Amino acid sequence: MDADDALRILSSLQRAGVEATVGGGWAIDALLGEQTRPHSDLDVWVAAEDLEPLIKSFVDLGLDRLFPWGNDRPWNFVVHDGGALRVDLHLYEKLSDGRVHYGGVRHGDDFDFAFLRGHGTIREMPVACESPDWALLCHTGYPPRAVDHEDVKRLCAKFRLPLPDAFR
């Protein structure tokens, strides 16, 4: 998925009134201000209350199919268009205390909404993205791939974050 595709999806969501936050590899590239590698999908964080306009926006883009990947959950699943467009969707609930809840009722996580209020750019277009700290944390919750090693090293270097042991 190239930058034009990512921006087309984000622009469509914005026109629909959906407040989307870029996550994953695109978040790191947005924080770095440049695309550093190819991406197979666009991770997007969206409040569950925006699901209806999000679905309408996705259908207009042809993002109307589920992409089973083995870890599908009601709050995290992948949709695609049968071609190059693929979105890894992360739905959360806004809490009254300024945090968000991500996950199920029994096994979810609450975290500060500020983690989803980072600022970055994709092709010089300003986008909301994960904060540097949160992007780093999200990349350490699973066995790292080769691209994750490069992403994390670049992120830590730019924002002077300590490099996690698994990435040394």
Residues covered by each model-derived region:
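Compositionally biased terminal segments of proteins
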Residues: 1-168
